[in-house]
Design a protein with these regions (language model features):
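Single-residue signature of alpha-solenoid repeat helices
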Residues: 204, 271, 308, 346, ...
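Extended alpha-helical scaffolding segments used for macromolecular assembly and cargo binding
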Residues: 179-265, 270-274
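Short coil/turn linker motifs that delimit alpha-helical repeat modules in TPR/alpha-solenoid proteins
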Residues: 157, 180, 197, 213, ...
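Alpha-helical sensor/transducer elements of the RecA-like P-loop NTPase core
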Residues: 1-61, 66-75, 80, 95-97, ...
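C-terminal boundary/linker of central alpha/beta nucleotide-binding cores
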Residues: 8-9, 14-17, 53-55, 97-175, ...
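Amphipathic alpha-helical segments of tetratricopeptide repeats
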Residues: 148, 225, 272-282, 312-321, ...
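Tandem amphipathic alpha-helical repeat scaffolds
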Residues: 218-227, 253-266, 287-305, 325-343, ...
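Helix-turn-helix DNA-binding segment
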Residues: 636-639, 643-691, 695-697, 704-715
Length: 715
């Protein structure tokens, strides 16, 4: 025999014993709740055609409660506009209110009804908050009793937290508004103060706005606004200020926080409006400091960061003793220091910021700081440190569900750079893609240009044929943008040599020359400018002039922005010296390059060198001293042609754009006159291009040219 009991509350007798004995099957309200599809089917039985968005909203409002859905169907049937009826379907709806009063409220003792009315504002009701709102010390017992007696009062996973069904809660709020509206507003205020202590910033802001008390919201933001920004709630702070129509022109501290919040979520238009409105005003010290931080942060999203640092005197600021404000300053200043190339200062500020953010429990700021530290150590050419910090950032983000957070984009970029400089192309490609996916709407200029450049570089390394030409073109275009003049010396020092390499690989000598001139204009007399000038001269066959320039790097007074530049210079010098017939001199310069690169695992310039370096290493085994193992690793990478298809090779001179186009026609069986007709040129012109292709590839015939071009990734 089976006994079925149906009721809105648990029977008090025998149920616990049956449950323990395993003789009881229970179907609770959540088991009987309709799914979205079932809700749609119910409406369909009433002949109602409701779109997916409205069905979803209705299901969210009713939480699948069958009676609520039935009432909604009856309401929609009588409505002129379905969308409006759904939007207005809450506990204040007449049909719903009548049902709840008749079926739920009327049979309750007066003290329980009063308790429900006194605690209806919060979406989730902590027992402590219930005590404070109701004034009843037995609030926990009351809530437990209500949850047992009524399916519309739910106990959460945390047994100390309850929730009223949204329909019941909106009914109670509407009823309280009719009886004593000030009580409901007071509830929102008390709830906001309670939630701030949890902390639950977004919900606290919502309740403060709902209280209608501007002074309360202002105090809440003034005391907690910086903390909200550190916790990733800047967007909610900004929305609350808008909803409440706070007069920012009369509230400088709130205005400064609103500007910082807008910058945090990439709302540059709002940030610019607020900053412009307060650009010539005098404020209290705290507001002034926040506005100055906002000005520097705005410049980091596009503008002259170095001038902003000078105008704000931020580099000389001492700590204030207010932890959240100090953290904001350290993170901003640490990131900004990278623009003028102050990597040591950046690392000091960011290390202090990481310690402070960790102690304060601001995980979002911890993630940002870890990412920035990976960039700062990378700028200092500490590649092991860079890998350490980027890995820490990625590992920190993963369990928190932040794998696509814009705060992680920089760490992904540096992880991709690690893969690039070590020759791990699959890793480079993966992290370059993740970095692009993580970019926000208006990211830091340095981060965005770095990420976009890395994506183009990854596409170049993993492509063959015309795909390489497209990737190189995209890389070139990125560095023509005005933002390229705003990035740090480190990013310029790492990226522009790749711009030159890619340009030369597709025959765009003019692009390479322009890139070298750009660096010379920004960093005149620097090692970076000299090496790029030498690269361009070497590409034009002017090896002697290139070597003359490279010798100047041995002078002590040549400024160096990234130490890797000198490694690249030694590798280039080794190639040119070898081409002049001096094997011993070439080997000596190569060992100079190994001296710095070996202990740091820096391989990229050697991987870019190609066949001449492979041959030099292979014929010099035993001559590298403590670098024998490193030399063997480089040789292995260079000779693994199957695994490195598409890497730079021994091509004597880069192909021009037209030669690249003609090369793509060579695998076909078409005659030269047919190819000439396609391009609108003479047969002799095509033959001239083909002869140049053969010479540059070091082959003597069409079939050999195709095979060699495929081997080196040009096809």
């Amino acid at each position: 025999m089976r006994i079925i009991l149906i009721g809105r509350s648990d029977p008090t007798s025998c149920i616990p014993r049956l449950r323990v004995a395993g003789l009881l099957s229970e179907l609770r309200a959540k088991d009987l709740a309709f799914s979205v599809a079932e809700s749609a089917a119910l409406l369909d039985t009433h002949g109602l055609r409701v779109d997916t968005a409205d069905i979803t909203q209705l299901h969210r409002r009713t939480e699948g409660w069958p009676a609520g859905l039935r009432l909604a169907a009856l309401t929609i049937e009588q409505a002129e506009d379905v969308h409006t009826a759904v939007a207005q379907f809450t506990g204040s709806n007449h049909a719903v209110a009548d049902y709840l009063f008749t079926e739920v409220i009327r049979g309750m003792p007066a003290d329980l009804v009063e308790f429900l009315l006194a605690t209806c504002a919060p979406e989730e009701l902590d027992i402590g908050l219930a005590r404070q709102l109701s004034g009843r010390q037995d609030a926990g017992q009351v809530l437990e009793r209500l949850s047992r007696a009524n399916a519309l009062v739910l106990q959460m996973a945390d047994p100390a937290v309850y929730r009223y069904h949204s329909i019941l809660r909106t009914y109670l709020a509407a009823e309280l508004t009719k009886r004593a509206p000030a009580r409901l507003l007071r509830q929102h205020m008390v709830t906001a103060d309670w939630l701030i202590g949890k902390p639950s910033y977004a919900a606290a802001l919502s309740h403060s706005v709902a209280s209608g008390d501007e002074n309360h919201l202002v105090r809440l933001i003034e005391r907690n606004g910086i903390r909200m920004i550190h916790s990733g709630k800047g967007g909610r702070l900004l929305a609350a200020a808008r909803e409440a129509k706070l007069p920012l022109d009369r509230l400088p501290l709130i205005a400064a926080m609103a500007a910082l919040a807008a910058l945090d979520v990439g709302d540059l238009a709002t940030a610019d409006t607020v900053l412009a409105a307060h650009s010539h005003s005098a404020f209290d010290p705290r507001s002034t400091m926040l506005f100055r931080i906002a000005h520097v942060q705005r410049r980091m999203l596009g503008g002259d960061v170095i001038s902003a640092l000078d105008r704000t005197s931020m580099l000389s600021w001492a700590r204030t003793g207010e932890p959240d404000l100090d953290l904001l300053m350290l993170v901003c200043r640490g990131s900004a220091r990278l623009r003028p190339g102050d990597t040591a200062g950046a690392i000091n500020d960011l290390t202090a910021a990481l310690e402070l953010a960790t102690s304060l429990g601001h995980d979002e700021t911890v993630l940002w700081t870890l990412s920035q530290l990976s960039g700062a150590t990378g700028s200092a050419c500490d590649f092991l440190g860079m890998q350490h910090w980027s890995n820490r950032a990625i590992e920190f983000a993963r369990p928190r569900g932040w794998a696509r957070s814009p705060r992680l984009a920089y760490a992904y970029l540096l992880a991709a750079w690690t893969g690039f400089q070590t020759g791990e192309i699959d890793s480079q490609s993966l992290y370059a893609q993740l970095a692009e996916e993580a970019l926000g709407r208006h990211p830091n200029v340095e981060v965005e240009l770095g990420v976009r450049s890395m994506a183009a570089l990854a596409a170049f390394e993993s492509s063959t044929g015309f795909g390489r030409y497209e990737a190189a073109t995209h890389f070139h275009d990125l560095w023509q943008a005005p933002a390229a003049r705003e990035v740090s010396p480190a990013l310029t020092g790492f990226a522009v040599p790749q711009e030159v390499r890619l340009a030369l690989s597709i025959g765009e000598l003019t692009w390479a020359r322009d890139a070298a001139a750009r660096v010379a204009g920004r960093f005149p007399g620097s090692a970076e400018a000299l090496v790029l000038a030498a690269e361009v001269l070497a590409a034009r066959g002017k090896n002697r002039e290139a070597l003359t320039i490279l010798r100047r790097l041995r002078q002590d007074d040549v400024p160096v922005h990234v130490r890797t530049t000198l490694v690249a210079a030694d590798v280039l010098a080794a190639r040119l010296i070898l081409a002049a017939g001096d094997r011993h001199g070439s080997l000596s310069r190569l060992i100079d390059a190994f001296d710095w690169a070996d202990q740091r695992g820096f391989r990229r310039p050697f991987l870019d060198a190609g066949a001449w370096l492979a041959e030099l290493i292979a014929t010099s085994t035993g001559e590298f001293g403590r670098h024998e193992r490193f030399a063997a690793q480089i040789l292995q990478s260079l000779t693994d042609s199957d695994d490195s298809a598409g890497r730079p090779t021994s091509i004597v001179s880069p192909l021009t754009r037209r030669e690249t186009e003609v090369l793509r026609d060579l695998p076909s069986q078409r005659y030269f006159d047919q190819i000439a007709q396609d391009y609108g040129v003479s047969v002799n012109t095509v033959k001239t291009h083909v002869a140049s292709i053969y010479r540059k590839l070091g082959v003597t015939g069409r079939r050999e040219a195709v095979l060699e071009a495929r081997r080196i990734g040009l096809l």
